[in-house]
Amino acid sequence: ELCEKEQPDMIVGTSMGGMYAQQMRGFKRILVNPAFTMSTNSKVLKTGEYHFFNGRYDGAKTFRITRDIIQHFNQMERQQFKNITEDEKQLCWCLVGLRDTTVTNAEALFKKNYLADHVIRFDGEHQLTEKVIKKVVLPLVERLRMKE
């Protein structure tokens, strides 16, 4: 709904956000270390209470992951790659950190469902650094903007 309302030029999502961004059909998308299979990856999604990495507008400091939440993600994950058209394949790119030990199957799943030449490997880990943003993400954003 938000994308339909705002009509963004491009969507960039990392980790879990990359999995969500992949499903936002009709928009140019860059997925960075996308966590396509969170519900079965114990490093990404396990029950318990956690602290947010960054501040939130609502002031919340923690969040809880329950078994119901994990089941919800599992159902969504099983549907996420359905009905991807050839046009959609042109709109989606995947950036994969060579030293990412959190999400290790993103490249294989992306290549299975999208275009292999839309995968870019970079020297980095799971979480983005300022260096990776400047040297990898922003140049791809500019390159894709120039294609408009």
Predicted ranges, named:
Residues 12-21:
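Gly/Ala-rich beta-loop-alpha elbow adjacent to hydrolase catalytic centers
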Residues 7-10, 91-93:
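Short active-site oxyanion
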Residues 1-5, 126:
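Active-site catalytic motif of lipid deacylating hydrolases and related acyltransferases
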Residues 24-25:
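Aromatic pocket-lining residues of Rossmann-like dinucleotide-binding sites
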Residues 28-30, 34-148:
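The alpha/beta-hydrolase serine catalytic core
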Residues 9-12, 28-30:
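Residue in the alpha/beta-hydrolase core beta-strand immediately N-terminal to the catalytic nucleophile
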